[in-house]
Amino acid sequence: MKLSELFNPNEFAARHLSFGDEAALLAAVDEKSMDEFVGNTVPQSIRMPSELDLPEALTEADALAKLKGIASKNMINKSYIGLGYYPTRVPNVILRNVLENPGWYTAYTPYQAEIAQGRLEALLNFQQVCIDLTGFPVAGASLLDEATAAAEAMAMAHRVGKVKSERFFVDERVYPQTLDVMKTRAKYFGFELVVGDFAQADEGEYFGALFQYVGKDGDVQDLQDVIGRLKAKGTIVAVAADIMSLVLLKSPAELGADIALGNTQRFGVPMGFGGPHAAYFAFKDEFKRSAPGRIIGVSKDASGKPALRMALSTREQHIRREKATSNICTAQALLANLAGMYAVYHGPKGVKRIADRIHALASAFADALVSDGLNVVHKVFFDTVTVDFGNKEKADQVFAAALESGYNLRRVNDTQVAAAFHETSACEDLVDLYRAFTGKDTFAFADDVKGRLNAELLRQDDILQHPVFNSYHTEHEMLRYLKKLEDRDLAMNRSMISLGSCTMKLNATAEMLPITWAEFSDIHPYAPEAQTAGYRELLADMENSLKAITGFDAISLQPNSGAQGEYTGMLSIRRYQEAQGEAHRNICLIPKSAHGTNPATAAMLGLKVVVVDTDEHGNVNIDDLKAKAEQHRDALSAIMITYPSTHGVYEEGIRDICRIIHENGGQVYMDGANLNAQIGIMQPAEVGADVLHMNLHKTFCIPHGGGGPGMGPIGLKAHLAPFAPGHTLTDTHSASAGQTAVAAAAYGSASILPITWMYLTMMGKQGMEQATRWALLNANYVAKRLSEDYPILYTGKNGRVAHECIVDLRPLKAESGITETDIAKRLMDYGFHAPTVSFPVAGTLMIEPTESESKAELDRFIATLKSIRREVQKVIDGEWPKDDNPLVNAPHTAADITGNWAHPYSREEAVFPLPFVREHKFWPFVNRVDDVYGDRNLVCSCPPMENYED
């Protein structure tokens, strides 16, 4: 035997892909080889002229070792920087059983409520935490970050307010990263931001105002008077409040505000160099239909039992398109679950003890400094002690002394230094920091500490009184609660999730391991650059790999969701055109088949949407495109186009589309939702795109997390690169100075980038191209097998689809009365999550199997849909009544088959319709959820469940 043949650097590709299935899959689609298949599927006109310029693959062990070497270049100092990011402790029971558990992180956004009741309950818990702490009756299930939430509050204030003004007041004490993002958003909404002293906010006329509750430098101000004066004028008031401080302080609602927002990172989520973290967003009840993001509500199921669901979805981009309240799609569900569970585990007494400890340590430190003659700037504070040394030299000396001792402080200005205390602060830290600030080695502090918060600002009401926050404080109880919820959810650790346009592929264990390494998770986003060399190397690696894959000249990693990447790409076009003296270009062409985020994004940037028709094959109608591009040539800004098309087909005219837009003065934005069908086969930049957003949570293996996190970096041609987002506190190496940001952190959700780095490193150049080929092969195998029972709506060259296919249920629905929803719910009885329902065409299922599913799993899924087709036939033939059959009654629960049974089909037909289901059985926790009841009777807090038993 040859020793060289016993080492296999491509071992991971063989774990990600099912190479042993190749011959059978090719035979099923009537092809002799993979090369022949790809040649018959992908138009030659779009094929990239050269191979991918990526390194060869490394094994799992070698990739982890290499990444560990990179991570070790980061320096973990004790962080006292603050500014919205704080060290915290993730309870280990939550770390292991949620964050590191594929039952939680591989699930999709809970559109199919019946198989997502566990996650929905966890998100409802999160909402209840936000409701209790803010005092408002309604809270959402997370936004992307605090800065984005502030921008959303500004937009919502304009929607719901009555003041006829385009001016918005911003407290000068807000975090600088928040103001940066608000400037970006305000410009294209046509708002004027006025930044000033909070106490003078009522001196002008504003449609809205934002105050920081615990200012950026640590002060806590009583906002009641100024809020009252603004409310008297009709101004909508938002308060950005530190979530931990609200454990002790009066709620924003009690202060008189209309909206509260902030970051929940302090509730057990690592800093992670800036993200991901779940922002909270709470508000008055009358604003609920104008709010951005997901809201979880209590409804009932078909049997009358309480059931949870995503409520008020008619506000959202996939329905309202350019009239949506926001372009938000993915949010931060996994991080919201972590924060909610932190409150569940610690309970009201536990979180108060933590908040009191933080405040007591800060107060003790301030007392010691004052007794030593130092000037503590703010007399009333929660966690941040700011000291003015009166001269730069002394401030420099203190800052350097702390750094030498392993502490990162915040330099407020030339003469001021701040220390922000947090959950992991300890008494020995007081000694070290006192030495740095005073030069003295001894520090004796009294055990009895007087707090620095005014009595009139303290919270008087009780928080977290619901039983869920008072029942699971031992690890055994918490472990079992988490397991109970996990078992109510269908995630990819149970079966494939074939959601079209979502790319639910393997999230390999080796990819996930590094995100909890302290070298990545415990780094503050504003840590000194010398301490973040590992992150800088990781970022550079990522940018170079993404440039090689897409063909673009520059990459921005800042956008922390796909929708935000979309916004950022279009923003770069707008900024470029303004710099060219073409700010008047405000027409955006969007194909009729586009995802709802596209028109919503265009509207956020002040663009007017002009819809382009598609032809009978699902392709962009080139004649209509040409006519509309020429009609609007003087005002044409861009086209937003998805490739392969949203209909799952490689459009052969993509180069012509790009040429027509360019000839008429526009730019080409390509939506990267379907990038999984491109890598190694084509490059978006090479076919004519000017900018592209990529979903790292689709194509590049970051898990969907049950509704986030995601990352949406953009690739840009050289002429657009200077207009990518910058950052007010970080000199981003991928953007020019002077451009405002789109996210709170310079590199978005940086701590999950190691997932994509590992995927690219373990797959290598050959594996990445193989992944694309397998995605195409699996999709065409499914389409070919299902075409025997269902029409495949759109196909391209040689009758092929790209990486997904659309099954047309409309003829069957017309004949039987069985709807696409009935089929989606019936799939649950077989143990499968439904494909994408009624998008991009109503009455269809869009199926994307991805490259990482085996033939055995594909065959189970195909057998399921074939079995369902036979069930529909029984309805057509009259064997089962139209109003009483396994489809309209789906899904079936364990309670159904153990109770009275009066249906014309058997219990076995209901829950074990095929032999394999017995082995793989997943039991939905509730029957079909009543969406209408839930929206008409909106409850988005944790009610006593017995209230709903009747």
Curated annotation (Swiss-Prot):
One of its GO terms (molecular function) is glycine binding. It catalyses: N(6)-[(R)-lipoyl]-L-lysyl-[glycine-cleavage complex H protein] + glycine + H(+) = N(6)-[(R)-S(8)-aminomethyldihydrolipoyl]-L-lysyl-[glycine-cleavage complex H protein] + CO2. InterPro entries: GcvP, GDC-P_C, GDC-P_N, GDC_P, PyrdxlP-dep_Trfase, PyrdxlP-dep_Trfase_major, PyrdxlP-dep_Trfase_small. Keywords: Oxidoreductase, Pyridoxal phosphate. The modification N6-(pyridoxal phosphate)lysine is found at residue 698. One of its GO terms (cellular component) is cytosol. GO terms for biological process: glycine decarboxylation via glycine cleavage system. The keyword Protein biosynthesis does not apply. Gene3D superfamilies: Aspartate Aminotransferase, domain 1, Type I PLP-dependent aspartate aminotransferase-like (Major domain). It is an enzyme of class 1 (oxidoreductase). Its cofactor is pyridoxal 5'-phosphate. Transmembrane segments: none annotated. The keyword Transferase does not apply. Its EC number is 1.4.4.2. PANTHER family: GLYCINE DEHYDROGENASE (DECARBOXYLATING), GLYCINE DEHYDROGENASE, DECARBOXYLATING. HAMAP family: GcvP (MF_00711). The glycine cleavage system is composed of four proteins: P, T, L and H. Belongs to the GcvP family. NCBIfam families: gcvP, PRK04366.1. The glycine cleavage system catalyzes the degradation of glycine. The P protein binds the alpha-amino group of glycine through its pyridoxal phosphate cofactor; CO(2) is released and the remaining methylamine moiety is then transferred to the lipoamide cofactor of the H protein. This is Glycine dehydrogenase (decarboxylating). It comes from Neisseria meningitidis serogroup A / serotype 4A (strain DSM 15465 / Z2491). The gene is gcvP.
